[in-house]
C-alpha cells in the first residue's frame, strides 16, 4: 500500500447541512486519524437529492461558521453541495491547494441507481470535475448506526488507497456503511461495481389549496432483480461497500470486467491486508 508522505489538505462537505451529526462524526474520525488539515464548506440547510445541481444566475451567500470542533476554517453556504465544492475549490480555499474532498457522512445509504440523485455523491463528482480525488460517505438507515470507534483507521486506509491511483483515470469512491444487525461490528470491506437496484419513491398527495396541489416524495420500495447486485449484497452481508465514481464518460466503459476483477483482487491484497485494517476486521 502506498503511504502518504505529506499532511493532506481536506475539504469536507455534505448534503444534510453543516450542523448535521454526520459531519460531526466525519470530523471526529479525521481528527483522530490525524492525516490532514480540515476545511469545511457545507450547506447551511439540508440539500438532499440535489445531485449535481448548481445555482446559476442566483446569488449564493457563504458565511464564516464557528464550527464546534478544531478545524482550520468553515463556511456555511446558501446553496447546493455542488455549489459548496465549487466555491471551496475555486474561491474559499483556493490558496490552500486542497488534496482531497470528502462528502458526508450522509444519513441513509447512497447505493445502486439511487446514487444518481444524491447530493452527497454530486459533491464528490464536482471535485472530480475540478481534478481533485474525492470520497462520498453514507451510513445506511440512520447516522446513529455509524461505528465511530472503527472509523478513523478505516478512513485512513481508504484515503491511502484512493491516493494510490488504483484506477485508470481520476476516480472517486462511493462508500456505504451497513446497518449491522444487533449492534454487531462491520465484518469487512469490498470493492464492488455500482448496482442496478432502484429505491423508488412515490409522490404522496398532501392536499390542495386554491387549486394548487401539494406532494411530498417518499421512498416506498426497492426494485431487485432475480439476484442482488454485488453492491446491495455487500451491504446485506454487513460489509462496507466501496464502489468507484469515474471522472470520464465513455460509450464502452473504462474497464473490462476482467480489469475490474483484477482491481478487486488488488483491493483485497493491498488494503485489507494492511496493518490499518487487519486489526479492525
Swiss-Prot record:
Q: What class of enzyme is it?
A: hydrolase
Q: How is the cofactor bound?
A: Binds 1 divalent metal cation per subunit.
Q: Kindly list the places in or outside the cell where this protein is found, as annotated in its UniProt entry.
A: Cytoplasm
What does the UniProt keyword field contain?
Answer: Cytoplasm, Hydrolase, Metal-binding, Nucleotide-binding
> Which cofactors are reported in the record for this sequence?
a divalent metal cation
Main localization, broad class = cytoplasm
The entry's cellular-component GO terms read: cytoplasm
List of residues binding a divalent metal cation: 15-16, 48, 106
This protein's source sits in the domain of life called: Bacteria
Q: What is its EC number?
A: 3.1.3.5
Pfam (any one):
SurE
Q: What is this protein called?
A: 5'-nucleotidase SurE
The record's family statement is: Belongs to the SurE nucleotidase family.
Q: Which SUPFAM superfamilies match?
A: SurE-like
Please write the reaction equations for the catalytic activity of this protein: a ribonucleoside 5'-phosphate + H2O = a ribonucleoside + phosphate
Q: What does this protein do?
A: Nucleotidase that shows phosphatase activity on nucleoside 5'-monophosphates.
Drop me one GO molecular function for this one: exopolyphosphatase activity
What's the source species for this entry? Chlamydia pneumoniae (Chlamydophila pneumoniae)
Amino acid at each position: 500500500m502506498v503511504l502518504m508522505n505529506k499532511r493532506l489538505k481536506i475539504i469536507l462537505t455534505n448534503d444534510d447541512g453543516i450542523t448535521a451529526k454526520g459531519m460531526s462524526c466525519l470530523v471526529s474520525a479525521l481528527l483522530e486519524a490525524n492525516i490532514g488539515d480540515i476545511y469545511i464548506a457545507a450547506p447551511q440547510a439540508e440539500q438532499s437529492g440535489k445531485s449535481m445541481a448548481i445555482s446559476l444566475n442566483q446569488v449564493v451567500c457563504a458565511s464564516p461558521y464557528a464550527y464546534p470542533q478544531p478545524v482550520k476554517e468553515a463556511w456555511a453556504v446558501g446553496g447546493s453541495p455542488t455549489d459548496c465544492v465549487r466555491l471551496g475549490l475555486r474561491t474559499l480555499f483556493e490558496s490552500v491547494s486542497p488534496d482531497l474532498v470528502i462528502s458526508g457522512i450522509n444519513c441513509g445509504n447512497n447505493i445502486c441507481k439511487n446514487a444518481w440523485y444524491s447530493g452527497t455523491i454530486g459533491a464528490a463528482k464536482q471535485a472530480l470535475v475540478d481534478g481533485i480525488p474525492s470520497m462520498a460517505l453514507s451510513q445506511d438507515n440512520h447516522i446513529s448506526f455509524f461505528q465511530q470507534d472503527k472509523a478513523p483507521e478505516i478512513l485512513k486506509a481508504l484515503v491511502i488507497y484512493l491516493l494510490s491511483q488504483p484506477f485508470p483515470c481520476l476516480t472517486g469512491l462511493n462508500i456505504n456503511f451497513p446497518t449491522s444487525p444487533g449492534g454487531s461490528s462491520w465484518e469487512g470491506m469490498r470493492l464492488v461495481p455500482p448496482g442496478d437496484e432502484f429505491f423508488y419513491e412515490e409522490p404522496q398527495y398532501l392536499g390542495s389549496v386554491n387549486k394548487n396541489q401539494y406532494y411530498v416524495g417518499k421512498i416506498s420500495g426497492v426494485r431487485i432483480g432475480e439476484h442482488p447486485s454485488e453492491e446491495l449484497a455487500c451491504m446485506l452481508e454487513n460489509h462496507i461497500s466501496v464502489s468507484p465514481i469515474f471522472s470520464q464518460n465513455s460509450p464502452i466503459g473504462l474497464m473490462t470486467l476482467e480489469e475490474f476483477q483484477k482491481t478487486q483482487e488488488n483491493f483485497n491484497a493491498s488494503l485489507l491486508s494492511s496493518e490499518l485494517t487487519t486489526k479492525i476486521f
